[in-house]
Amino acid sequence: DIYSAFASTVYERPINKNDDPVERFVGKTAILGLGYGMGAQKFKDTLAAGAMGPPVHFTLSQAQNVVNTYRSTYRGIPNLWRKLEDLLKQTLHKDNYGNVYGPLTVAANRLCLPNGMALNYHNLRYSSAGLVYDSRNKTEYTYGGRITENVIQALARIIITDSMLRLDKEHDVALTVHDEIIITSTNINPNATMDKIITDMCIPPSWASDIPLDAEGGYAREYSK
């Protein structure tokens, strides 16, 4: 449980889901939010809002301590923010077109994905605020954490879509909900069917053959959480 593990680091004592729901919620909010550059004030406000759990009230100093702990515990994540921001800046200069970083390829104002699609930043340019681009009828500001969120969501979507295509060969894929795939099946052996589905969902893509994938599931006559 990564939420409890990080909460244990923050509170300097063992935290578990059953006995420490408030502390674990702090860990969950940190893991889900701080990975994309959320700062102390936004973290404090998110905890107080209690949208995903019980409202928790931190001082700004306490919130900053959690942010600092996250960034020092997972040093590779801030490094990724900087790397992806630099990669997006490369899209502004044609001498960089074709540069590759992992599954991403640099092109004009966009980062090309391994499935042939791309993250487009129309009219990307520098401003006094930093990197900005045109989005519909407004100008959007972007930075390392937000670019990282764009990339992670896009790559994750490719992975789950690949799983859907594999599963659709044997079953009827009805819909998806976030990272869930819901299928209908007439197979009379639901346990074996579920085992096969989980196996198919854990097949890594060729462009990230060492990515650690895992899945779990269940079955019923109707969809429920």
Please give the residue ranges for each predicted region.
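Conserved catalytic core of nucleotide polymerization and phosphodiester-bond processing enzymes
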Residues: D1-K225
